[in-house]
Amino acid sequence: MDSKYLFVFLIFNVIVIDLCQGFLWGLIPGAISAVTSLIKKGRRRRELGSQYDYLQDFRKRELDLDDLLSKFPDY
């Protein structure tokens, strides 16, 4: 191979490798942050669902208490 073409080939390889490395170094942290945010959103939805169930149970107990108090005579 002629030395002129070898130099062009090496420079081209350096440019391509640098672009790929920049792309991967930008892609990997972005992918990690996307996965962690999805995990946090899933956990948050579960917490909100459990709070909703807790409030439903609380309202049911409150209604049971109202029924119990309504059975007592008024003094």
Curated annotation (Swiss-Prot):
Signal peptide stretch: 1-22
Signal found in the keyword field: yes
Single GO cellular component term: other organism cell membrane
Compartments, record wording: Secreted; Target cell membrane
Tissue: Expressed by the venom gland.
Key words of the record: Amidation, Antibiotic, Antimicrobial, Cleavage on pair of basic residues, Cytolysis, Fungicide, Membrane, Secreted, Signal, Target cell membrane, Target membrane, Transmembrane
One example of a Gene Ontology biological process annotation: killing of cells of another organism
Modified residues (Lysine amide): 41
Propeptide: 47-75
Function, in words: Antimicrobial peptide that acts by breaking the cell wall. Is active against Gram-positive bacteria, fungi and antibiotic-resistant pathogens: S.aureus (MIC=5 ug/ml), M.luteus (MIC=5 ug/ml), B.thuringiensis (MIC=10 ug/ml), B.subtilis (MIC=10 ug/ml), C.albicans (MIC=20 ug/ml), methicillin-resistant S.aureus (MIC=5-10 ug/ml), and penicillin-resistant S.epidermidis (MIC=10 ug/ml). Also shows potent activity against antibiotic-sensitive and -resistant Acinetobacter baumannii (MIC=10-20 uM). Shows cytolytic activity against human erythrocytes.
Similarity comment: Belongs to the non-disulfide-bridged peptide (NDBP) superfamily. Short antimicrobial peptide (group 4) family.
UniProt note: domains: Amphipathic and cationic peptide with an alpha-helical structure.
Extra remark: Negative results: has no activity against Gram-negative bacteria (E.coli and P.aeruginosa). Inhibits hepatitis B virus replication in the HepG2.2.15 cell line by about 30%.
Protein name per its UniProtKB record: Antimicrobial peptide ctriporin
